[in-house]
Regions:
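Positively charged n-region of N-terminal signal peptides that target proteins for export
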Residues: 1-4, 21
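Small/flexible residues
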Residues: 4-5, 202
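Bacterial N-terminal signal peptides
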Residues: 8-16
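Beta-rich carbohydrate-recognition modules and glycan-binding surfaces
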Residues: 21-240
Length: 240
């Protein structure tokens, strides 16, 4: 009889513990509400459409080969226009072509950089660009600069495909506002947090030979504009 009573008591205690655990999972923790359910206003914005001749510069070591670039008429057929760009198709007709003539096979790389850093307002979540590849296993990186002017590179993907493909990379958030890619600070005024410097292509040593072609179009970002869109109209701007 004592064993039966003891077992019943243990069963009741276990059920209460499970109920308490389930309640703690379902009920919001006041200490985490601000962090877990912060408001956001994500928008996809155009950063550059590669429409201006001379706005991008290409470079590679003179020991490795010769690189040139120019604009061409063209567009990815699968590209969807942004809502703000509907009806403006005539303003988006160019792509940036890059040609590399390798001297020899080796561990080569080349860069495609904007003539000026491209600032993105808000807190950038992802970057995307349309790339026309030639099925060679080179690798593309985005070169960015954070709020404090520190340089970072973000892996966008392999170029081992033919035709147009949209490559996307995630911008990792800073864990503490000091390390990693910092995009805002309460201590240093109000300014765009992320700047795009350009791209770097790391070449596959076995395929870095002959002539290589690639094309770029429609550089975009998904950014959180909540703080900007909910800024009081009569508030002052800390940008002087």
């Amino acid at each position: 009889m004592k064993k039966l009573v003891t077992f019943s008591i243990l069963a009741v205690l276990a059920a209460g513990l499970v109920f308490a655990q389930n309640s703690s999972l379902q009920e919001p923790n006041p200490e985490n509400v601000g962090a877990d359910s912060a408001e956001s206003a994500l928008r996809e914005v155009s950063v550059d459409k590669f429409e201006r001749e001379g706005s991008w510069n290409v470079h590679m070591s003179a020991d490795d080969g010769v690189i040139t670039s120019r604009l061409f008429e063209g567009n990815p057929a699968m590209k969807e226009p942004l809502p703000d760009d509907e009806g403006k198709e005539g303003e988006d007709t160019q792509v940036l072509g890059v040609r590399v003539d390798f001297f020899r096979r080796g561990k080569n790389s080349f860069t495609i950089k904007s003539g000026r850093p491209l600032a993105i307002e808000g807190t950038t979540k992802t970057l995307s660009v349309w790339v026309c590849g030639r099925n060679q296993d080179h690798e593309l990186y985005a070169l960015v600069q954070d709020y404090f002017g520190r340089n970072f590179e973000l892996y966008m993907g392999s170029l081992g495909f033919s035709g147009w493909k949209k490559l996307i990379c995630v911008v990792p958030p800073s864990p503490d506002g000091e390390h990693g890619i910092v995009q805002s600070s309460a201590y240093y005024g109000d300014k765009p947090g992320l700047k795009i410097i350009g791209f770097r292509v790391d070449c596959n040593p076995m395929q870095a030979r002959g002539t290589y072609y690639m094309y770029f179009d429609d550089l975009r970002a998904v950014t959180d504009l909540y703080d900007m869109e909910n800024h009081d109209e009569d508030d002052m701007a800390d940008n002087w």
